[in-house]
């Protein structure tokens, strides 16, 4: 729940900041000055919605490094670090993507992949994961993250978030205009948006943002099943990924920052807002999958 909340709040912050800038530039007055211009509003919503989502994507890797305290490694350190880098290199080559940056961060068992582009992503694992799993299980977890990159999940989730943002921005302003018109129906002398418009759009931007987060979380859960299957393919068998998930079931997962939401290995909390399916469901999906 904390991870998806951070995701929602950060995304909303970007969209709201863009909204404030647009208001200062007089965009709202242009949209509503002579009646609601739906065509212009749709264009504005698309720019706002996808702009906010892609800004979040572009800053995801540096934000992830900062928020999780990731230490980037190149394989020149300890034997364990060399093994991690070589494992990422091998799996990335098998998946047909460029070599990601590799990092380690302190904390409870977890891992994540992030970044705007397939060939310049970041894969990071926690010290708790390295200490609590066998190498085969860690390799399966890394395979899961590499599969996220190969599947284009960062861009896919950004596009979905962009669509949801567009819906939020468009609908909140349509309702805001209707509320504002109803409140000042006897005051035809006023032009441009009034207080009712601004208050309504701000409240609905936040409220509808949480509704959109439920939809985004559902899509994220489907991507997790695909990444699990991708890890099994990269490993050549399902058992290492099943074993890693089973072991995670007995561990206390770390909380990932927003920039890794929907991409970490640990399970989420909450039926609607969870970005990850229950570990039991993921294990069952792997066990029931047909292997070539």
From Swiss-Prot:
Its main location: membrane. The active site is at 145. Signal peptide: none annotated. It is an enzyme of class 3 (hydrolase). It comes from the Bacteria. Its cofactor is Zn(2+). One of its GO terms (molecular function) is metalloendopeptidase activity. GO terms for biological process: proteolysis. Its EC number is 3.4.24.-. Keywords: Cell inner membrane, Cell membrane, Hydrolase, Membrane, Metal-binding, Metalloprotease, Protease, Transmembrane, Transmembrane helix, Zinc. It is found in: Cell inner membrane. Binds 1 zinc ion per subunit. The chain crosses the membrane at residues 4-24, 39-59, 159-179, 199-219. GO terms for cellular component: plasma membrane. It is a multi-pass membrane protein. HAMAP family: Pept_M48_protease_HtpX. Belongs to the peptidase M48B family. This is Protease HtpX homolog. The gene is htpX.
């Amino acid at each position: 729940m904390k991870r998806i909340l951070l995701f929602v709040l950060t995304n909303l912050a970007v969209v709201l900041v863009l909204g404030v800038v647009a208001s200062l530039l007089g965009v709202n007055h242009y949209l509503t000055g002579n009646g609601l211009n739906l065509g212009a509003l749709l264009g504005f919503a698309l720019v706002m919605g996808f702009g906010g989502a892609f800004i979040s994507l572009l800053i995801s890797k540096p934000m992830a490094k900062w928020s999780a305290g990731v230490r980037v490694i190149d394989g020149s350190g300890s034997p364990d670090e060399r093994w991690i880098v070589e494992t990422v290199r091998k799996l990335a080559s098998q998946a047909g993507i460029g070599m990601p940056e590799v990092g380690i961060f302190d904390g409870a068992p977890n891992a994540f992949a992030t970044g705007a582009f397939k060939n310049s992503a970041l894969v990071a694992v926690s010290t708790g994961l390295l200490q609590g799993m066998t190498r085969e299980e860690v390799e399966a977890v890394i395979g899961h993250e590499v599969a996220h990159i190969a599947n284009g999940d960062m861009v896919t989730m950004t596009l979905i978030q962009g669509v949801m943002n567009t819906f939020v921005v468009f609908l909140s302003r349509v309702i805001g205009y209707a509320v504002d018109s109803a409140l000042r129906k006897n005051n035809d002398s006023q032009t441009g948006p009034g207080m009712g418009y601004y208050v309504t759009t701000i409240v609905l931007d936040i409220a509808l943002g949480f509704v959109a987060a439920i939809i985004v979380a559902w899509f994220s859960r489907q991507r997790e099943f695909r990444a699990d299957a991708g890890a099994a393919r990269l490993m050549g068998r399902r058992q290492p990924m099943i074993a890693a998930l089973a072991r995670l079931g007995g561990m206390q997962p770390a909380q990932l920052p927003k920039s890794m939401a929907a991409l970490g290995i640990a399970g989420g909390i909450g039926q609607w807002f969870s970005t990850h399916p229950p570990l039991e469901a993921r294990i069952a999906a792997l066990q029931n999958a047909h292997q070539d």
